Amino acid sequence: MNKTIIIPCFNEKQTILTVIQNVKNNLIDGDEIIIVDDFSSDGTRDLLNNLNDPIIKIKYHDRNYGKGKAINTALKESLKEVVIIQDADLEYNPDE
């Protein structure tokens, strides 16, 4: 069963690339990652803009709406049967 991993983020410049790599290490063929940047101002957007990966969709909010809205934005884009939400701050490591 394929899954979507949703990563809502806000000002996660220090952790976002690590989280993305950790999530990618645990994917199977057909899975997707959707990242929603909730109007970061610390350079997170610049890092995301430089990603070029066909399994990653990136959505950007035009202002800070909060985590709930970021999740809802991603859910509208999800094409898979199973959805997992992974916070960008590494509080929960996807390798564990």
Q: Regions from the language model: what does each represent?
A:
Residues 2-4, 32:
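Cell-envelope/extracellular polymer assembly enzymes that use nucleotide-activated donors
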Residues 9, 36-38, 61:
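Conserved sequence signature across two-component system core domains
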Residues 12-25:
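Short, well-formed alpha-helical segments that are part of the catalytic scaffolds
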Residues 12-15, 40, 67, 93:
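Donor nucleotide-sugar binding loop of glycosyltransferases
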Residues 31-34, 45-77:
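Conserved donor nucleotide-binding strand/loop of the catalytic core
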Residues 37-46, 90:
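A conserved acidic beta->alpha catalytic loop
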Residues 83:
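Short aromatic/hydrophobic "clamp" motif used to bind/position activated sugar donors
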